[in-house]
Amino acid sequence: MLGKVLRDRLIRAITRPPFRDELGRKGRFERIARAGPHLIRRLRLVIDGWPRWSHPLRVIFLSDFHTGSHSDDVARLEGIVAEARAFTPDLVLLGGDFVNMQLFGAGRVPPKVIAAVLARLDARYGQFAVLGNHDYLYGAREIADALRAHAITVLDDESRSVKVKNHSIDLVGIPNARVVSARSKQLLAGLVPESTVGSGRPWNLYRPIAAT
């Protein structure tokens, strides 16, 4: 029993150093921990039965930031958010993995810093997020609290309906698609395909059912 306690403490010490690196600089490892370029994909989706508006609904989906994995990660996140803002989104969906472990350098990037950057994304219909597996490993409560403090809705086996003119889009957040809870099954069973965006982790198990 004592061995398990010591092992668990060691694992926590390795994977959960303090949230104290405000910039994500990685300390002495800065030069060898650069992130690769991020990927932007544009899709135009048409839904049968929906009107063809003069201003199509613009949805931005951002995911897998892993902030803290690379040097200057906060500046990298700021750049991604600036690019997303240029698309003038109507709705923002955040797919989780906001943080990652920081074995080297000054410590992990505080969730409040990440949430403050993401809050710069203005969207008339709001921002909605699910947590990823890294978020659960390295501080789900802290991350969810930080996002909510910046008016970002976190969907944890929950759904929300967004009114768009005379139509509605149902957002369903399934945080961990590997372990589908009774609540998850209930939410998925009640989906209306014409109006639902389903999102879960990992993403290859769920696809957007409808979006435009």
Locations of regions flagged by a protein language model:
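Core catalytic region of metal-dependent phosphoesterases/phosphodiesterases
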Residues: 72-163
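Conserved catalytic scaffold of divalent metal-dependent phosphoesterases
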Residues: 47-52, 66-69, 100, 133-212
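Residues at the starts of beta-strands that form the adenosine-phosphate
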Residues: 58, 90-91, 126, 168, ...
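Short secondary-structure boundary segments
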Residues: 27-45, 100-102, 106-118, 169, ...
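Short hydrophobic segments within beta-strands
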Residues: 62, 95, 130, 172-174
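Acidic, histidine-bearing metal-coordination/catalytic regions of metal-dependent phosphoesterases
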Residues: 1-58, 62-72, 78
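A short linear-motif detector with a strong N-terminal bias
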Residues: 18-25, 37-41, 71-72, 108, ...
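A short alpha-helix capping/helix-coil boundary motif
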Residues: 58-61, 121-124, 192
